[in-house]
């Protein structure tokens, strides 16, 4: 737990940096999820599907943690699912990197999911990630939320592969 906390804080503190590598973002989300598993007495599972060869690409810092936090707090924690699971997928396709956080928790209506990205909800963590994706990548970046009540939620991010940081 101590190692997970120190890793999480080390990778989260921004030191003025808005970009990080995929490898550091993976370290951050793994540390965050370890902390959450301890806090939840391992009452949910985490399944990772991470492609090789992506470690050195630059991405916006802290794009996965808010998504995982919402999946746990608003999906897994409030679900009656007997096998609560959070899936973390990172893969590449052509000139893009795809990130997905998915849960089999409570879910929500698609209308409510759409409102999260259009300033019609009170939350700001997920919307902040969406805003940063649009500022950094414009039409080349994308974030979508798909959800079904009682089935779970899938948050999907697509960004171009970059090896140099564009500063916000």
Regions found by a protein language model. Name each.
Residues 157-163:
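C-terminal beta-strand of the catalytic ATP-binding
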Residues 1-146, 152-156, 167:
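Two-component histidine phosphotransfer core
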